[in-house]
Swiss-Prot record:
GO molecular function: serine-type endopeptidase inhibitor activity
Keyword check for Glycoprotein: yes
Pfam families in UniProt: Kazal_1 (PF00050)
Full protein name: Ovomucoid
CDD domains, per database record: KAZAL_FS (cd00104)
Keyword terms of this UniProt record: Disulfide bond, Glycoprotein, Protease inhibitor, Repeat, Secreted, Serine protease inhibitor
Residue stretches making up the Kazal-like domain: 4-54
Species whose genome carries this gene: Rhea americana (Greater rhea)
Domain of life: Eukaryota
Length: 54
């Protein structure tokens, strides 16, 4: 089971690095920062499906 540590998020600005992650909402996030910000906004309902594009 893939996990990402989002304890240092949310962040106001994310880098432009491209390391895609697939969320449990079947959306591809461009990097960990984008994904973690979405996790925080979802109040923990969003989880990581897998690394890479959905």
């Amino acid at each position: 089971f893939a996990t990402v540590d989002c304890s240092d998020h949310p962040k106001p600005v994310c880098s432009l690095e491209y390391m895609p992650l697939c969320g449990s909402d079947s959306k591809t996030y461009s990097n960990k920062c984008d994904f973690c910000n979405a996790v925080v906004e979802s109040n923990g309902t969003l989880t990581l499906s897998h690394f890479g594009k959905c």
